[in-house]
C-alpha cells in the first residue's frame, strides 16, 4: 500500500501533530540560558525505574495543592516510580490532569475521509514541490540521518512530515513522547478511588482549524525552527529528559526552551479560530488550579513544567494571588 493511502500512518498524524504543537510545551518565557555542547547523538542512557522530580506544594490555610511537573520527551527506557504519588493519593480529594488529545477509531476513519487534505500535500504534489528549496534540502539531510527511506513522508504537508521526522530523531537518541504522566496518574487515581478532573487544553478540532487556515510562510517558520531542534537541539532535550528522570528541577529550569516552541505555538495561534489559543490554555490551567485551592481539601495536579516555570509562569501567578509555593525537596 502506498504512503499516500496508508490509513494507519495517516491515523497517527493528528495525535502526533497535536502532541508536537501542544503537549510538548505551553511555555512560559525561557529561564536563564546555559551554554550547550555541540550536537552529539549518543543515546540517552537513563533506564529503569526513576522517581522523576519532587512535587511543588501550594497552600494557604487548609487548602493544599500538590503539583507534579511533566515534560516531553523523556528517556524511552525509564519507568516512572509512582510511590510518592500513591502515598499522597491516600489523602487526596481530587486529581487534575490534562485531557488527552485522543479520538476513537470511528472518528479517525471519518477524519481520514473528510480531512485528508489537511494532512497531505495537495494536488498530487510532493513535499519537495511545496517546501522552499533550502528548507527541503535541510529536511532531506536529516531524513537521511534518521531513516533509510529517501522518499519517506513525501506526501505529507511540511509541518506533519517534520513532526514525523522529529519523532524518528527522538527514537534514535533514546527519547520518547510515549510516557504520559497524566495518563499514569489518572490510572492511579482511579485505582485509589480518587475523583479525576480533566483539564481540556485543546481538542482535535483546534488542531484541524489551525492546520486548515495556517499560511505557508507561517508553517515554514515552524518547520525551520523544528529542523533547528533536530539539527542542533537534541543534546538539550536529552539533558532535560535526564534531569527530569533524576529529579533535577534546577537543571530543567536553567535549560533553554527548544527553538521550535515559540515559532510553532505562534503558528498554531495564528491558525486558531479564537486567535488566542495559547492564552486560553494558560488561563484555563490557572483557573483550574485556583478553583481547586478555593474548594479546600487536597488536590494533586499534573502540569507541564514549561507552563509552571519561568517569569510569569503558573507558579508565579499563584504566588501573586497570595498562595505559598514550596519548591520540591531533593
Locations of regions flagged by a protein language model:
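Sec/Tat signal peptide C-region and signal peptidase I cleavage site
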Residues: 28-33
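A cross-kingdom marker for long, charged
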Residues: 267-330
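Structured, acidic catalytic/metal-binding patches in enzyme active sites
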Residues: 34-48, 52-273
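Bacterial N-terminal signal peptides that target proteins for export
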Residues: 3-17
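Residue-level recognition of short, well-ordered coil/turn positions
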Residues: 25, 248-249, 297
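Bacterial N-terminal signal peptides
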Residues: 15-25
Amino acid at each position: 500500500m502506498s504512503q499516500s493511502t496508508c490509513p494507519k500512518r495517516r491515523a497517527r498524524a493528528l495525535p502526533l501533530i497535536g502532541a508536537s504543537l501542544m503537549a510538548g510545551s505551553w511555555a512560559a518565557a525561557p529561564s536563564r540560558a546555559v551554554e550547550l555542547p555541540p550536537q552529539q547523538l549518543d543515546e540517552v542512557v537513563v533506564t529503569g525505574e526513576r522517581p522523576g522530580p519532587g512535587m511543588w506544594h501550594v497552600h494557604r490555610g487548609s487548602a493544599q495543592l500538590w503539583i507534579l511537573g511533566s515534560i516531553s520527551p523523556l528517556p524511552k527506557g525509564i519507568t516512572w516510580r509512582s510511590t510518592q504519588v500513591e502515598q499522597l493519593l491516600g489523602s487526596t480529594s481530587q486529581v487534575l490532569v490534562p485531557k488527552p488529545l485522543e479520538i476513537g477509531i470511528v472518528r479517525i476513519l471519518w477524519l481520514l475521509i473528510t480531512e485528508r487534505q489537511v494532512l497531505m500535500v495537495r494536488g498530487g504534489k510532493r513535499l519537495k514541490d511545496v517546501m522552499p528549496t533550502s528548507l527541503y534540502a535541510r529536511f532531506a539531510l536529516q531524513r537521511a540521518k534518521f531513516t533509510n527511506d529517501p522518499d519517506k513522508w513525501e506526501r505529507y504537508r511540511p509541518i506533519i512530515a517534520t513532526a514525523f521526522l522529529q519523532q524518528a530523531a527522538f527514537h534514535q537518541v533514546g527519547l520518547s513522547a510515549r510516557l504520559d504522566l497524566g495518563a499514569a496518574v489518572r490510572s492511579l487515581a482511579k485505582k485509589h478511588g480518587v475523583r479525576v478532573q480533566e483539564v481540556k487544553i485543546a481538542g482535535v478540532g483546534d488542531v484541524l482549524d489551525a492546520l486548515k487556515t495556517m499560511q505557508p510562510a507561517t508553517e515554514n517558520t515552524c518547520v525551520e525552527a523544528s529542523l533547528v531542534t533536530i539539527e542542533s537541539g537534541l543534546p538539550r532535550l536529552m539533558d532535560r529528559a535526564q534531569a527530569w528522570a533524576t529529579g533535577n528541577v534546577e537543571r530543567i529550569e536553567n535549560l533553554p526552551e527548544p527553538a521550535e516552541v515559540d515559532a510553532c505555538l505562534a503558528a498554531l495561534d495564528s491558525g486558531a479560530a479564537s486567535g488566542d489559543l495559547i492564552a486560553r490554555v494558560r488561563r484555563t490551567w490557572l483557573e483550574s488550579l485556583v478553583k481547586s485551592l478555593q474548594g479546600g481539601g487536597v488536590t494533586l495536579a499534573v502540569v507541564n513544567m514549561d507552563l509552571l516555570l519561568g517569569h510569569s509562569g503558573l507558579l508565579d501567578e499563584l504566588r501573586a494571588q497570595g498562595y505559598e509555593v514550596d519548591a520540591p525537596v531533593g
